[in-house]
Amino acid sequence: MPTMTKRPARTRLLPADRRAQLVACAVACFADHGIARATQAQVAERAGVSVSAVYSYFRTRADLVTAVLDAVAAAIVAMVEEADVPAAPLRSALSTLAHHTADMAVEQPDTVRVWLDWSTGVRADVWPRYLLLQGQLQAHVRAILAREAPASPALNSAARLFVGGAHTLALMRFEQVSAAELALFIDQMVGGTLAALRPDSSGMPLPVP
C-alpha cells in the first residue's frame, strides 16, 4: 500500500507578520515585473497564499503600490541614515555614503530595482511620491554638506548632484564593474560634489582639499 505524504501545515502568521511577508514578496514582484505591471495574483503566488488573502490586506492595487513604495522609501532612507557618520570629515562622510549606496544594490537588489523603475515614472501617479523621496535624500545630503559649508549658495545643487550619482552607482553594481572602477567613480562623484559646493567669486570651482 503506497505511503501517503502529508503536506506541511501552512504556518499561521500574526496579521502584522503576514502583512510584512506580503510586502516583501510584493517588492520582489515589483522588481521582476515593474511597478506598472505587478499584480496581487503574482504576489499571492510568490507568498504561497490565496489571492483573496492578499486582497484582505490590500483592497486595491493602489493600496499594494503604496505599501511597496513606502517600504522601498523607508529602506533607502534607513540606509542613508545608518551610513551617516556626523564626526567624519566631509569627504570621508560622502565617500562612506556613496559606498553604502552602491552596496545596497547587492544587499537589497529588489529594493534598488524598484527604486530605479520608480525614477522613470515621470507621467505616472507615483511620480509625486518619488519627488518626495528625492527631496528627503537631498535634504539629508544637504545637511551633511552644510556641516562644513553652511553658507554655500550651491548647497542645493551639490546635494542634487550627489543624489543623482546614486542612480549611476546602482547601475554600475548591476553591471558588475570592477571594484577599482567603482572606487574611481565614487572618488570622482565625491570630488565633483565638493567642487560644486565651493565656487570662487568668478564662478569657477575651487580646488578640493
Segment roles from a protein language model:
Residues 152-175, 183-195, 209:
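Hydrophobic alpha-helical segments that form the core
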Residues 1-17, 28, 200-209:
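N-terminal intrinsically disordered/low-complexity leader segments
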Residues 21, 25, 29-63, 67:
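Helix-turn-helix
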